[in-house]
């Protein structure tokens, strides 16, 4: 599911403190929104925010120092610079921007203010640089409009990698998470994980506000991990890099290969995520196994595949006629 709506007043309120901007014109329609088709078609937030450009409609148009000079009558050449200025400013209406932002501490031209009032286009002004405004708004909109879903499991920071522990209820995911926390790793979310596709190649996991810092362990109840283990034991968000799926031993023997030639992946929001399957059985140290799986994944991300190296070594020995034993 991908949200397609945000209003001008919501955008203004979200960054009133950070960007210290003022709402100069276009107060009549604070509910003015982004074009939903443009939001659905956007490949990234860069398609929704940028410097003033007559080729790209339906996006937040940022007017910096150079753009203000372009819209001033003194910059217009010809017999009637005022008429040319009016023409340049009027073209902005055809872009149907949800919001117009004048940055770099510039004073918006009077004709631009009047045009925004007539066309009911919200006009914000800020002392911050145009580049900074673009960075802030792109980051905000990339999260707001991101494809999203929720998954059941425990999401953790293990050795700097975002790892989602999944499996059927009762296998001990939360207990495993608690043991990993005691070994120095960090908790992002327990039970419910909100996942957002924040870019073409990245999925970010966060904890619902209601469950933040909490871990439920059967027989003990709710634990406040931040209060018990300290600030370093929790994380606000992580990029999802690995799924560790816990199964019963009989399920592993029946449904999965012991040494899969091809690595396993699971589709999350249209993006393949590496997956490792670990059997839960008496006497197995799951925390050590998960750490080993994470370390192996780090090697694979660096281009080192132990299993493929072993297969190649085996082929080389067969070709040489030496058993290697």
UniProtKB/Swiss-Prot annotation:
One GO process term, biological-process aspect: regulation of carbohydrate metabolic process
Positions of Mg(2+) binding: 174, 216
Record GO terms (molecular function): ATP binding; magnesium ion binding; phosphorelay sensor kinase activity; protein serine/threonine kinase activity; protein serine/threonine/tyrosine kinase activity
Required co-factors: Mg(2+)
Stored InterPro entries: HPr(Ser)_kin/Pase, Hpr_kin/Pase_C, Hpr_kin/Pase_Hpr_N, P-loop_NTPase, Ser_kin/Pase_Hpr-like_N_sf
DNA-binding is among the record's keywords: no
Protein residues bound to ATP: 167-174
E.C. number: 2.7.11.-, 2.7.4.-
Region listing for Important for the catalytic mechanism of both phosphorylation and dephosphorylation, in residue ranges: 215-224
Pfam families per record: Hpr_kinase_C, Hpr_kinase_N
Function, in words: Catalyzes the ATP- as well as the pyrophosphate-dependent phosphorylation of a specific serine residue in HPr, a phosphocarrier protein of the phosphoenolpyruvate-dependent sugar phosphotransferase system (PTS). HprK/P also catalyzes the pyrophosphate-producing, inorganic phosphate-dependent dephosphorylation (phosphorolysis) of seryl-phosphorylated HPr (P-Ser-HPr).
PANTHER family attached to this UniProt entry: HPR KINASE_PHOSPHORYLASE, PROTEIN YJDM-RELATED
Protein's UniProt name: HPr kinase/phosphorylase
């Amino acid at each position: 599911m991908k949200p397609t709506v945000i209003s001008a007043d919501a955008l203004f309120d979200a960054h009133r403190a950070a960007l210290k901007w003022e709402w100069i014109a276009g107060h009549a329609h604070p509910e003015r929104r982004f074009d939903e088709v443009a939001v659905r078609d956007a490949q990234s937030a860069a398609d929704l925010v940028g410097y003033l450009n007559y080729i790209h409609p339906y996006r937040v148009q940022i007017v910096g120092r150079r753009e203000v000079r372009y819209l001033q009558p003194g910059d217009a050449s010809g017999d009637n610079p005022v008429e040319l200025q009016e023409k340049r400013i009027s073209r902005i209406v055809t872009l149907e921007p949800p919001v117009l932002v004048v940055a770099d501490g510039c004073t918006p031209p009077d004709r631009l203010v009047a045009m925004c009032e007539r066309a009911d286009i919200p006009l914000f002004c800020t002392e911050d640089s145009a580049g900074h405004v673009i960075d802030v708004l792109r980051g905000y909109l990339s999260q707001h409009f991101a494809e999203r879903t929720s998954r059941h499991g425990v999401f953790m920071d293990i050795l700097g990698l975002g790892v989602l522990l999944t499996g059927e209820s009762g296998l001990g995911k939360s207990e495993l998470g608690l043991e990993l926390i005691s070994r120095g790793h960090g908790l992002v979310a327990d039970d419910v994980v909100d996942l957002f596709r924040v870019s073409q190649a990245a999925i970010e996991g966060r904890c619902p506000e209601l469950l933040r810092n909490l871990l439920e362990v059967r027989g003990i109840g709710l634990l406040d991990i931040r209060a018990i283990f300290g600030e370093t034991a929790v994380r606000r968000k992580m990029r999802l890099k690995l799924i560790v799926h816990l199964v019963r031993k009989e399920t592993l023997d029946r449904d999965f290969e012991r040494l899969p030639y091809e690595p396993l992946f699971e589709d999350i929001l249209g993006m393949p995520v590496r997956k490792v399957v670990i059997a839960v059985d008496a006497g197995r140290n799951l925390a050590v196994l998960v750490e080993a799986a994470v370390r192996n994944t780090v090697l694979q991300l660096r281009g080192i595949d132990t299993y493929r190296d072993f297969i190649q070594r085996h082929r080389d020995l067969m070709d040489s006629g030496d058993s290697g034993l």
